[in-house]
Amino acid sequence: MQTQVLFEHPLNEKMRTWLRIEFLIQQLTVNLPIVDHAGALHFFRNVSELLDVFERGEVRTELLKELDRQQRKLQTWIGVPGVDQSRIEALIQQLKAAGSVLISAPRIGQFLREDRLIALVRQRLSIPGGCCSFDLPTLHIWLHLPQAQRDSQVETWIASLNPLTQALTMVLDLIRQSAPFRKQTSLNGFYQDNGGDADLLRLNLSLDSQLYPQISGHKSRFAIRFMPLDSENGQVPERLDFELACC
């Protein structure tokens, strides 16, 4: 059985931001619990990058707009024969609840910005080797606290992002499920099509091909060029089958 590799590519700035936030939040929990310097730096570096992303745009505003848009889309299915009405109603209520929590939450990331330890580490992350014990004795002593004490603090930091995480997860799940995968074929390593106002491209490609896609474009039109992983000896077949969803 062939192994399929999923590639996702945003077709607008809001989706690019959402995917980056999703990626960084996922990275926060990869190396938990924090037991050493390496795990701590991985965690704090991702926190710092998250805060940088938050400061660049209106994340809350865009998410609230999308939660409302998804509710309107679901409402068009109310009363349609053959559609699970209880499921539609449940999703609409979940979207409303996520929006209410998000709109009443403090400024996104504010709890993390105001934390003294996070602020100290952020100041040193851009300096090569800047998080040594003599540079950051605060972090050094924190790593020697009882594990349960560190775990509790980390859980509190992550929980402060719950209003955002809940809303973002719902939005991205609905967008990803909005379009099915369809078989497509590239010619000489190239494929292009109309986006149809899509926000996100999802592409399944066989690992056996040892190829990856370079995607460019926007919601109205996009192009995909397939490139060999081995840039010197790899080859791109004249015809290449893959699966594509325009969400």
From Swiss-Prot:
InterPro entries: ZapD, ZapD_C, ZapD_sf. Belongs to the ZapD family. Cell division factor that enhances FtsZ-ring assembly. Directly interacts with FtsZ and promotes bundling of FtsZ protofilaments, with a reduction in FtsZ GTPase activity. Coiled coil: none annotated. PANTHER family: CELL DIVISION PROTEIN ZAPD. Interacts with FtsZ. SUPFAM superfamilies: YacF-like (SSF160950). GO terms for cellular component: cell division site; cytoplasm. Pfam families: ZapD. It is found in: Cytoplasm. Keywords: Cell cycle, Cell division, Cytoplasm, Septation. It comes from the Bacteria. GO terms for biological process: division septum assembly; FtsZ-dependent cytokinesis. Its main location: cytoplasm. The keyword Metal-binding does not apply. The gene is zapD. This is Cell division protein ZapD.
